[in-house]
């Protein structure tokens, strides 16, 4: 039978391996999945703890284990599943007998609710699959990446195949899970309940294909997802949008979105955050910040920096207004009393926010001082089932990246560097996540860091996380890195990727994308965690609030659009009666688009050919940027090209001119151009100043 070696070269990257294969005894080949199933689903290998691998799912899943010899951080931190507020959502969702999606901003408890629902279904004997489109969130609740679950390649560049190709790939993978893969992973056909997180990062085409394939495979063509119970969560404020993004084509604008998720719930409470700050965060999301709100936000954030005594007093006052010292945690942070965490915050200088472009340069050091360590499985570990081996190895490699656990891939820390802790340590460690410290000493296997706010100097070892499949526990991929974040690399995109970035000075001129203001403020606990300036310059720019998300959230929450009699439709640039706005919006985004170049409405079916006319091309002869619709006229009148190809051009060799005339190569045939991005053109002063002349 064919034997397949497990090697780590497919993950792409350089590894520092600490595994010495020569010193380890050679163990036999891995067990077959069918062999384990014959022994019984509850029988576990003797050298693993029973609670670690015990499962009621009926199929294999990825196990992510933290080595106790390193930093004992909990990257999952879903500690509030049994709270009364969480269980109320669980009871309502299970009693609805419908597919449910929970929407909300960061730290509103979405992931905790999903995990609690999944465990409640497992307690009832259901087969539950945990799936997420985000690698960090998939690791936190012990699930799969969606691409591995449905059998697609991990799409780094949004390379979406056609609908027919998607349907075929999903059906083929479901059949492989039942036959070739021997039930080592769940599939759309084998599970009873699907816990689906980060729907906002999913392409609408993939969701539509999942629905169609489930209807065929499960034999229920009239039911959404073929009768599969789906509990989903999404943060549509985190859509990858920018000010010039389209107003249509989003996943919540699918024609059958209401059929796929009949019950849509909006979570508005940001846990662990003061109520006054939460009010301003929601106003920032919906674009409702007034001049008084902006003044209050800037004044209260800077008040704790001017007077250290006022900071402590204000922190205690706000602590009584928080959502509770221990509550549902969506970002995984441990909720402790605000007065304890903010006691010494006024003594620490805030770190200035840098732009995303500057952060990329600082974040990608060519020769980092603390590179990540990746321990690969020994080469003599082999799988007798080639198909299973290829699939599982690929899944483990892509699920064991540093980004999947919220760790920094390459650190470049030296003595005196400012850092903050990414995860909570154990009780004896005495330092909570987000605490800012200074590196005092750099060792080979530990960093000595002093945390002045808690008056502690501790040795921070590397955090060791291993990933393996319970059917093949001998094959493990391990990553090691210090659970620290360099403070000089704090930028908007890094604040949204790596958690617990507090004590930051937010300059709104460094914010770049839509909803950046609300997304960053949602990560703060109190006004003492940040200072902010130039809010007015960012909040009133066109496109800084994502209009489709705002309308969708107000609709499912039954919020009034406004008190005005008419509403402005951003898609067709017209005023619509408030009572008919939702009906108009649904039809408008499916029928027309607005062309900003022509300032006119374009039917949606003609949008592609119309946009092609506005494509900018660069004339390689005269160096001018020309619209494609005007290219034909330009190529006949380009002065530089006419001078070059003209038979009277004395700078061209005579033989060249004769050949050009004999072969009929005139100026039009030799004229060349290349594609050109409109964003590369020089901007006017009005655009650079944000609308001010």
From Swiss-Prot:
Q: What are the boundaries of the transit peptide?
A: 1-67
- The transmembrane residues are none
Location within or outside the cell? Mitochondrion matrix, Kinetoplast
Residues covered by region (Disordered): 300-348
Please note every region of biased composition (Polar residues): 321-330
Question: An example of a Gene Ontology BP annotation on this entry?
Answer: DNA recombination
Q: Which UniProt keywords apply?
A: DNA damage, DNA recombination, DNA repair, Kinetoplast, Mitochondrion, Transit peptide
Q: Which cellular component terms (GO) are annotated to the entry?
A: kinetoplast; mitochondrion
Describe the disruption phenotype.
Essential, it cannot be deleted.
The keyword Nuclease is annotated on this UniProt entry: no
UniProt main location, coarse: mitochondrion
**Could you confirm whether the keyword Nucleotide-binding appears in this record?**
no
State the PANTHER family in the record: EXPRESSED PROTEIN, TRAF-TYPE ZINC FINGER PROTEIN-RELATED
What does the record give as the function of this protein?
Answer: Required for the maintenance of mitochondrial (kinetoplast) genome stability. Probably has no helicase activity, missing at least two of seven conserved helicase motifs.
Q: Subunit structure, per the record?
A: Monomer.
- Which family, according to the similarity comment? Belongs to the helicase family. PIF1 subfamily.
Q: Which protein are we looking at?
A: ATP-dependent DNA helicase-like PIF8
Q: Which organism is it from?
A: Trypanosoma brucei brucei (strain 927/4 GUTat10.1)
